[in-house]
C-alpha cells in the first residue's frame, strides 16, 4: 500500500486488489471535531461520494469503478485510472478535449449533479477517454432553482480560474469549454453563465 495523495479530508493509497491496481480512499478523523459528529460527517460524505459517482456513471460520465466501500470505516476502494490529467494536457498545448469536458460537465449539471472540485487534476484522459474523479465535495440537487444555478456556476468557476492561467490561450480554452457546455445544457446554460458572470464581477471566487 503506497500513499499517493494526502489532502485535508482524505488520504489516497495505491493498493493491490487481487492482482489489480486499485485506489483506496480513506477519510481520516479530524481531531478538532467532536468524535461522534466527525464520524457522522465522514460517513455521510463517503456514502454521498459513492452515490454521486453512481449517478455520473448512469448519465454517461466516465468515473472510476467502485469495487467496494465501507461507510463505517469511511473507505472507498475503486479503480485506478492511469492517464494524464487535463492540467498536464493543457500544459502541452493539447486543448482539443475541452469541448468534451464542457459536454460532460453539462451532463452532470443537467442531472442536478454538482461535482464540487472541477480542478483540471480531477479530469483524467485514459486510453482516449475522459474520466472525472474525486466527487468528495459533490452534491445532487433536485429541481431547477437559482440556488442550483449558483452552485453550478461555482462548480464551473473553479475550472475557469485554472484555464485563465494559460495566458493568451485562455480565451480560446474557455470558448471551447463553453461550446460543449451550451450544447449539452441548452437554454439553461445562459442562466448558469449569468451566475458565473455575477460571481466573477463581484470578485467572489468561491473555493469549495
Where in this protein do the model-derived segments appear?
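ATP-binding glycine-rich loop module of kinase domains
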Residues: 2-47
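Residue-level recognition of conserved beta-strand positions in structured domain cores
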Residues: 17, 26-28, 36, 68, ...
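Conserved structural core of kinase catalytic domains
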Residues: 31-32, 42-46, 57, 61-101
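Conserved catalytic-core motifs of eukaryotic protein kinase domains, centered on the activation segment
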Residues: 35, 88, 141-145
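Conserved kinase catalytic-core helix
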Residues: 55-61, 87-121, 126, 130, ...
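C-lobe/activation-segment region of protein kinase-like
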Residues: 131-208
Amino acid at each position: 500500500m503506497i500513499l499517493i495523495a494526502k489532502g485535508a479530508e482524505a488520504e489516497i493509497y495505491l493498493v493491490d486488489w487481487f492482482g489489480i491496481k486499485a485506489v483506496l480512499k480513506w477519510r481520516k478523523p479530524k481531531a478538532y471535531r467532536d468524535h461522534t459528529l466527525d464520524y457522522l460527517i465522514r460517513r455521510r460524505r463517503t456514502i454521498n461520494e459513492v452515490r454521486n459517482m453512481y449517478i455520473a456513471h448512469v448519465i454517461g460520465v466516465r468515473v472510476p469503478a467502485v469495487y467496494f466501500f465501507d461507510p463505517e470505516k469511511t473507505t472507498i476502494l475503486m479503480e485506478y485510472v492511469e492517464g494524464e490529467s487535463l492540467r498536464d494536457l493543457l500544459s502541452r498545448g493539447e486543448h482539443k478535449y475541452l469541448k468534451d469536458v464542457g459536454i460532460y460537465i453539462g451532463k452532470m449539471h443537467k442531472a442536478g449533479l454538482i461535482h464540487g472540485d472541477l480542478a483540471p487534476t480531477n479530469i483524467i484522459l485514459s486510453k482516449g477517454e475522459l474520466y472525472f474523479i474525486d466527487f468528495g465535495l459533490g452534491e445532487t440537487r433536485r429541481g431547477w432553482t437559482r440556488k442550483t444555478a449558483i452552485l453550478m456556476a461555482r462548480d464551473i468557476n473553479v475550472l475557469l480560474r485554472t484555464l485563465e492561467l494559460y495566458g493568451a490561450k485562455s480565451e480560446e480554452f474557455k470558448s471551447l469549454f463553453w461550446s460543449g457546455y451550451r450544447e449539452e445544457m441548452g437554454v439553461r446554460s445562459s442562466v448558469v453563465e449569468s451566475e458565473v458572470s455575477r460571481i466573477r464581477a463581484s470578485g467572489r471566487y468561491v473555493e469549495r
